Amino acid sequence: MTKGNYSYPLDPSWSTEEITTVLHFLSQVEKAYESKVDRDQLLEAYKAFKTVVPGKASEKQLDKAFQEASGFSTYQAVRAAKAKEKGFVTLGK
């Protein structure tokens, strides 16, 4: 899927640092779909993301909003990364 114009699902109550953390994670997810992303980098970005969005319900809401806007699933990207021991994650068609 090609990169389109869409808005990121961000919470206005987040600090600049928290927004940067979430955007970095979403960027890693985009890379997994558009080309490839290093598994370890994606999981590190996810770990940092979970410090901003620790709850499962909030994570699912953000994933749903991001998937509706972009077509990319954070859940599927993290699942694919966890399934690999090393290397790159590629989810694009």
UniProtKB/Swiss-Prot annotation:
It comes from the Bacteria. SUPFAM superfamilies: BH2638-like. Gene3D superfamilies: BH2638-like. Belongs to the UPF0223 family. This is UPF0223 protein stu0998. It comes from Streptococcus thermophilus (strain ATCC BAA-250 / LMG 18311).
